[in-house]
């Protein structure tokens, strides 16, 4: 199945402790059905000090399920994503406005 959410998309969190927060997708794992969104689902990771890094308690963004994310349209509202053919190219479009997300 084609990916409805991709790296670089602006999304809003629909459920969980970070409900309502907005961010940009930094990475997507389609096999696991999860994505990492910067500023969302932050956990503290304890890292050991090395010669290159100081170590300590570092915040890290953990993956969040794709079903808990919704794409933001140009109006800043959550929208579902659909696919349609434009010419010979398959493009994503916002179901609320009908605008093409990427050409």
Curated annotation (Swiss-Prot):
Keywords: Ribonucleoprotein, Ribosomal protein, RNA-binding, rRNA-binding. One of its GO terms (cellular component) is ribonucleoprotein complex. Pfam families: KOW, ribosomal_L24. CDD domains: KOW_RPL26 (cd06089). It comes from the Bacteria. The keyword Iron-sulfur does not apply. One of its GO terms (molecular function) is rRNA binding. SUPFAM superfamilies: Translation proteins SH3-like domain. One of two assembly initiator proteins, it binds directly to the 5'-end of the 23S rRNA, where it nucleates assembly of the 50S subunit. One of the proteins that surrounds the polypeptide exit tunnel on the outside of the subunit. Belongs to the universal ribosomal protein uL24 family. This is Large ribosomal subunit protein uL24. It comes from Ruegeria pomeroyi (strain ATCC 700808 / DSM 15171 / DSS-3) (Silicibacter pomeroyi).
